[in-house]
């Protein structure tokens, strides 16, 4: 049965090869000062930095820069950005990069004018944001997180060894996002396949809940098949525009709240990976890939019918002459085979985790779960199976 819901998403998407030309028009809605936030030098290498700075200058904008945003953005970088916002009375934060850069931009937008410690108030206590929020826009260069069209912001507090996520209300969503698949061509393959599994994990976290024939489940199955098919093409030819554009749009649809409408959701794989990332700083998608198979093997019997459906509808497993348990297991074997086919990581050891870290990760993970509510002991068992 579908839950009651209201659907609203305020982000305006400009998609395609010429989408950057729309930035000039978007800038007219905001004041003079723009905080340009990005990672390292990749946007400079592909010429995107120069294009954006030119558009900003032609629009009469005063540009303040914050560079060096890393994968798994840190609270210290958020504080650095907030200081720039206050000192320069920033009117718009323009994030150019992948999900980490956009997450950091959103974090700066809500915390710049926060009284007290924003991480404690907003990422631990989940207090409502009652201070000024600085608008955010984005130019996407790496796909996976869906941050370009949602209110999510995952931030790592280095001092606390805590990586927490928060989904903020629509006021924090990017006002606009520019998506040109060509900007993803230069992303290294390791990061590309990491992003691909991040997309799949977002979809599976929303899929593995309940056993009804929810319309949203059909949407998720279609998106999963699209990602799988196009990933195989993109891995062989990273410059295949059709494959990269389908992956990019699937990533956005996977986490713009549409794929979770009217459903219970899980997200425990992400909760475990967040703490893995806090201790190892590993690539998010690779951490998800390493955790997913042991996690699903641990809980699939509690949601057997949905795992059977997953096997049949996503992986085309034939049910003929097989028990439900056999079908479900075959679907998980197919998922694991795809993970290996794409060159994704399957061991926590390969991500820099030590045996001594596992209890620390388990005991600091936010407890939850969809089909089975987990304890810290359950999570430790899963982590040991991943190691």
Predicted regions and their residues:
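ATP/NTP phosphate-donor binding region
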Residues: 1-92, 348
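A glycine/threonine-rich phosphate-anchoring loop and its flanking beta-alpha core
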Residues: 11, 21, 114-212, 309
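Acidic, glycine-rich active-site loops and adjacent beta-strand->loop/helix elements
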Residues: 69-73, 100, 111-112, 141-144, ...
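Short Gly/Thr/Asp-enriched flexible loops that form oxyanion-binding sites at enzyme active sites
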Residues: 80-82, 101-115, 149-152
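Glycine/serine-rich anion-binding loops at beta->alpha junctions
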Residues: 90-106, 141-147, 279-282
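C-terminal charged capping/lid subdomain of soluble metabolic enzymes
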Residues: 171, 314, 318-387
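Active-site segments that bind and position negatively charged phosphate/pyrophosphate groups
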Residues: 206-329, 333
